[in-house]
Amino acid sequence: MSQEKKEELQSEAQVTKEETPQANEAAAEAEAIVNEFDLLQEELNSLKDKYARVHADFENIKKRLEREKYSAVEYANEKFAKDMIPVMDALHMALSSSSSIIDSAEHLEKLKEGIELTLKQLSTALEKHGITMVSHDAPFDPNIHNAIQSVDSDTVESGQIVQTFQTGYKYKDRPLREAMVVVAN
């Protein structure tokens, strides 16, 4: 071998020795990147799985709340209905007891008494659920009273209710039915 060839081989060997640590570093760095990529991929898959589970839980909760809301609306008047049952019982008892009473004066008095008690029971049940009668002692209010007539009156101030033809009712603050009244001029 010639001197030139020896020098060339030595320089190649030296270059290879110099490149080998760099190649090893590059390979190690590439392996580290691949490992980090694998870890990140696993974490991504785990997070996707968690997201899918949370989303499914959310949808289930949403459906359950919708069913509960529907049920609550469907049975919202259950307490009210239960409070009306005793009133119905009282009316049935009044009808059934009227056939056993022989004396007509006594019959009318007992029937009147039964109707008054039933009316009181009904008023109490309605008030318990926020349904009240519109006041007739207060000044005329177009939100809860319907003036069907106005009359001149010396005994009642102008704007006051003179007579009530039909009782009005409110549910809490909302009118259910306006009272039909006569108002003083």
Curated annotation (Swiss-Prot):
One of its GO terms (molecular function) is unfolded protein binding. Its main location: cytoplasm. Keywords: Chaperone, Cytoplasm, Stress response. GO terms for biological process: protein folding. GO terms for cellular component: cytosol. It comes from the Bacteria. Residues 1-28 are annotated as: Disordered. Pfam families: GrpE. It is found in: Cytoplasm. Residues 1-20 have a biased composition (Basic and acidic residues). InterPro entries: GrpE, GrpE_coiled_coil, GrpE_head. Homodimer. Belongs to the GrpE family. Participates actively in the response to hyperosmotic and heat shock by preventing the aggregation of stress-denatured proteins, in association with DnaK and GrpE. It is the nucleotide exchange factor for DnaK and may function as a thermosensor. Unfolded proteins bind initially to DnaJ; upon interaction with the DnaJ-bound protein, DnaK hydrolyzes its bound ATP, resulting in the formation of a stable complex. GrpE releases ADP from DnaK; ATP binding to DnaK triggers the release of the substrate protein, thus completing the reaction cycle. This is Protein GrpE. It comes from Sulfurimonas denitrificans (strain ATCC 33889 / DSM 1251) (Thiomicrospira denitrificans (strain ATCC 33889 / DSM 1251)). The gene is grpE.
